[in-house]
Amino acid sequence: MLISDRDIRRHLDSGRVRLEPSDPAMVQPASVDVRLDRWFRLFDNHKYAHIDPEQEQPELTRLVEVAPDEPFVLHPGEFVLGATYEKVTLPDDIAARLEGKSSLGRLGLLTHSTAGFIDPGFSGHVTLELSNMATLPIKLWPGSKVGQLCFFQLSSPTEHPYGSGAYGNRYQGQRGPTASRSHLNFHRTVIE
């Protein structure tokens, strides 16, 4: 069940859901707006011939920090990783989903490619998968609204929350945009 503004405020006030820093003005009818941090992870395409999710490729991306009053310019067709300014901490019975802001989507900005789901038990800054689908560069300002979190009440607490280790916890506690760690649990079924 999608959680309403009333229940979002109740969970934030009680500390069951934590957003740090928290700003009550960010609460919307059924979501909470999140803001863009100052760090971006750019792809160094010349380091590898291809991307292989099975292999660790530590030099695939590099971290870039912009000044608080300086925008990051995302060019047409470019893909970078960003992060939410807010650290998000969820209990074992609430999941979240990151959605883009419609005003930014109408400018051609995608905030996530596929990874919008946030498991119960997660704690950390949410990595954003930022793409510019427009034909002009887009300025991304640190501290500006970049997305929104919708919260879902589970039917019961999960047996193994994210971070417990049972299902993996590769991104627990992440700070800033975190590169893929797919090699740590790569699975491939042999299909004949």
Curated annotation (Swiss-Prot):
Keywords: Hydrolase, Nucleotide metabolism, Nucleotide-binding. Disulfide bonds: none annotated. DCTP binds at residues 101-106, 119, 127-129, 148, 162, 174. It comes from the Bacteria. It is an enzyme of class 3 (hydrolase). It catalyses: dCTP + 2 H2O = dUMP + NH4(+) + diphosphate. Homotrimer. Belongs to the dCTP deaminase family. The keyword Hydrolase applies. The keyword Nucleotide-binding applies. Its EC number is 3.5.4.30. This is dCTP deaminase, dUMP-forming. GO terms for biological process: dUMP biosynthetic process; dUTP biosynthetic process; nucleobase-containing small molecule interconversion.
